[in-house]
A protein has these predicted regions:
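Primarily the internal scaffold of c-type cytochrome electron-transfer domains
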Residues: 1-4, 26-37, 41, 45-213
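Mid-chain, structured segments of secreted extracytoplasmic proteins
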Residues: 2-30
């Protein structure tokens, strides 16, 4: 921030740093940081989807998590399909949208701001989709509040698929997405400080893909 002349007072407002290190909201026409990295950082701004994404039938009223689990059992296939389509349209990045989720992660973990990198910021985190979404960020408590499941409940309970299947998909899609975005950034790069670093990201991701295949 100092190297780019970003004032300390702006760090909790509408600064580029807060794009990744915080969650912004507009209140009374003023943009400010309301929290650190949050649900919305991964799943997208929640204003339009937060309520409907947990409504399993018309007229449903949220009471407790136990009641929510019971209510989800009553949801019809038709309602579920319509609900998931609607919340995706409203901006929710769902766990099943692995490519979109990976791109959203890499928007912060693979820097495209060449001035920021030239000022000393790292081009990339040691990001890997499987491990980074399976660590402290994992939050699959819907079916059991005491058991952080290895994969989302819809994936395992409704689609009858396993956590291992999901991890294999995440490994391949995450690596391909890293190559996709790094190549795009390399094609647009002009900074002598940025070009070799983003080129290194491409090479590393390509090597990982070769190991996978």
């Amino acid at each position: 921030a100092d190297a780019l002349g970003i004032a300390a007072a702006s760090l909790t407002k509408d600064s580029m740093c807060a794009n990744c290190h915080g969650t912004k909201a507009k209140r009374d026409g003023v943009v400010s940081v309301i929290s650190g990295v949050s649900c919305e950082s991964c799943h997208g701004p929640a204003q339009d989807w937060l309520k409907p994404h947990g409504e399993y039938f018309e007229g449903m009223a949220f009471k407790t998590l136990d009641q929510l689990r019971t209510d989800r059992e009553k949801e019809t296939d038709e309602h579920r399909a319509a609900r998931l389509k609607a919340v995706s349209k409203a901006g929710l990045i769902r766990p099943k949208q692995i490519h979109t989720l990976a791109r959203n992660c890499l928007d912060c973990h693979l820097i495209d701001n060449e001035k920021l990198v030239a000022a000393g910021h790292k081009t990339a985190s040691a990001f890997e989709l499987v491990s980074w979404t399976g660590g402290e960020v994992r939050h699959n408590f819907f079916m059991n509040k005491d058991d952080n499941a290895a994969a989302p409940s819809l994936w395992m309970k409704v689609e009858n698929r396993t956590a291992a299947q999901r991890d294999r998909i995440k490994l391949a899609v995450g690596t391909l997405t890293q190559i996709e975005m790094a190549l795009d950034r390399r094609a647009k790069a002009t900074s002598p400080a940025y070009i070799p670093q983003i080129g290194g990201v491409v090479a590393a991701a390509n090597g990982k893909l070769a190991q996978i295949s």
